[in-house]
Amino acid sequence: MTVLPFLFPAATPGLVVGCFIVNLFSPYSLDLVFGTLATLLACLLTQRMPNRWLAPLPPVLCNMVIVGAEIAWYLVGFGPGFWAAYAFNAFTVGVGELIACVILGQLLLTALPKVPVLRPFIPERRLANI
């Protein structure tokens, strides 16, 4: 979903609020702040990507770095095991985001511009990059 701001910048507030609501049910209380921050940052950066092939990059990197660190801190704190836990969690979050954002995201970025009712909401500069 965080690739949507590439086509629809107005989707950013809805994605951020939706992330916050979902994070209310997270076992990690810090997810309310950091998970939502990762989504906001990913959406804002995705809006600025020059083409659809780079659009999945911000969500993958933001979540990998921010959420990976959050989970590592939650599991082991900032003690000696933090960096090992961070490497593992950043990798696993990154792989999950890569699958979701690249594969499913590209499907969305291909299909949505073809829906006639949605085309008026896509900026012209984006339609040229599809």
Which residues are covered by each model-predicted region?
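Generic transmembrane alpha-helix motif of multi-pass integral membrane proteins
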Residues: M1-A11, A42-T46
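Membrane-embedded alpha-helical hairpins and interfacial helices in multi-pass inner-membrane proteins
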Residues: I21-A38, L44-I130
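Membrane-interfacial helix-loop connectors
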Residues: F6-P9, V17-P27
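Residue-level recognition of membrane-helix boundary sites in multi-pass small-molecule transporters
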Residues: A10-G14, L54
